[in-house]
């Protein structure tokens, strides 16, 4: 079952050992970056606990479809991006979350279809909503769930969770994946061609969920082509055109927005910045290719945007080696600033002005 999970050897080994030895914990907390497989692992482990024999059998399919009677999942909802008490407990009536839809409505009933009930709480950071009321409401349950029940929480970091929740769970850590592993999975399991897989593996920054999402988004790949054309134009444009190029860059950015699972943190703010952050990531990969070509030469450089090889070879001499390295550093610095809530318009205008200045 869990062998389907890519690159999370320690996490999978811990869960498999606990299952085989019959030493299961009542409450688990899966912690790691978004898009690395926490939710997928939670669903597969839930299916295994409920009697599934393989990733393809009927039990597993029902779990992933959200129709299994003994597996329930909840995640933050509404403008506040929190998990309310009404989403958890049936005694709290709410127009938006009626009692019969509360995740824990069947907690004290024996499983109906298999040996276990499993409750998955995605983006458990949302339990801090309402001054932690929802999180506090399940502390006793997390500490001493019924023998037939297991909880699996996912989060991007323990720092964003109530300490009292973390202390009641066994923490399982998930990490970023090497690009080579993501590339292999995209080709072997999802039918990507090698050039496409190489680009997506590099751009996903270690997040297999993001890579798969991007592979399924042809409009995003088309947006990448427009972005690289804009980058090529920016490399040759006069400095006076910087503001116009920055505006084009921001207008293009929404085409590069991806839907990545396992998102955590302040999702509302993050989603507003995500398109520009994605565009900057793609721009960084492009300049990384130029730097590799400039430093190592065409015969030895491993190019991520291999399908744009001719364009790269024509553009590699526009900047000096030193300027290319400075350009990459600048892009990463601008991206980091926007992640920390810097003004995206001012930041991108500065970026394109500086890129023009580096050309000399």
Write out the residue ranges for each language-model feature.
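Catalytic P-loop NTPase motifs of RecA-like helicase/translocase cores
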Residues: 127-130, 145, 160-161
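Conserved alpha-helical scaffold flanking the Walker A/P-loop in AAA+ ATPase domains
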Residues: 14-18, 86-118, 140
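Flexible beta-alpha connector loops of hexameric P-loop NTPases
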Residues: 79-90, 127-130, 171
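Loop/turn-to-beta-strand initiation segments
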Residues: 114-118, 146-152
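AAA+/P-loop NTPase substrate/partner-engagement loops
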Residues: 58-82
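Conserved catalytic/switch belt of AAA+ P-loop NTPases
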Residues: 134-150
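Walker B catalytic acidic pair
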Residues: 122-123
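Charged, glycine-rich active-site and insertion segments that engage polyanionic ligands
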Residues: 1-48, 52-64, 147-148, 156-282, ...
């Amino acid at each position: 079952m869990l062998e389907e999970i890519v690159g999370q050897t320690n996490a999978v080994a811990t869960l498999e050992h606990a299952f085989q030895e019959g030493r299961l914990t009542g409450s688990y907390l899966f912690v790691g970056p978004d898009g690395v497989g926490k939710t997928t692992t939670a669903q597969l482990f839930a299916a295994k606990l409920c009697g599934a024999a393989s990733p393809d059998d009927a039990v597993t399919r029902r779990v992933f479809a959200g129709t299994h009677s003994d597996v329930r999942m909840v995640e933050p909802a509404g403008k506040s991006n929190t998990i309310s008490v009404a989403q958890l407990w049936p005694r709290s009536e709410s127009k938006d979350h009626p009692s019969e839809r509360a995740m824990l409505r069947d907690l004290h009933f024996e499983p109906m279809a298999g040996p276990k009930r499993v409750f998955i709480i995605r983006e458990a950071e949302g339990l801090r909503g309402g001054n932690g009321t929802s999180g506090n409401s399940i502390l006793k349950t997390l500490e001493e769930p019924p023998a037939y029940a297991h909880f699996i929480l996912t989060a991007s970091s323990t720092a964003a969770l109530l300490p009292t929740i973390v202390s009641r769970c066994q923490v399982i850590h998930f990490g970023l994946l090497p690009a080579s592993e993501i590339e292999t999975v995209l080709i072997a399991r999802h039918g990507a061609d090698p050039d496409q897989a190489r680009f997506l593996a590099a751009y996903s920054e270690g997040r297999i969920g993001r890579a798969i999402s991007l592979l399924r988004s042809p409009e995003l790949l088309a947006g990448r082509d427009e972005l690289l054309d804009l980058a090529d134009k920016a490399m040759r444009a006069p400095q006076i055109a910087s503001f116009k190029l920055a505006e084009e860059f921001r207008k293009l950015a929404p085409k590069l927005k991806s839907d990545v699972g396992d998102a955590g943190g302040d999702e509302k703010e993050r989603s507003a910045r995500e398109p520009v952050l994605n565009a900057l990531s793609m721009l960084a990969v492009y300049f990384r290719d130029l730097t590799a070509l400039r430093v190592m030469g065409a015969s030895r450089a491993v190019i991520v945007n291999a399908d744009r090889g001719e364009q790269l070879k024509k553009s590699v001499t526009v900047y000096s080696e030193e300027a290319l390295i400075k350009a990459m550093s600048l892009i990463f610095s601008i991206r980091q600033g926007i992640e920390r809530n810097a003004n995206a318009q001012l930041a991108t205008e500065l970026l394109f002005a500086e890129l023009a200045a580096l050309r000399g």
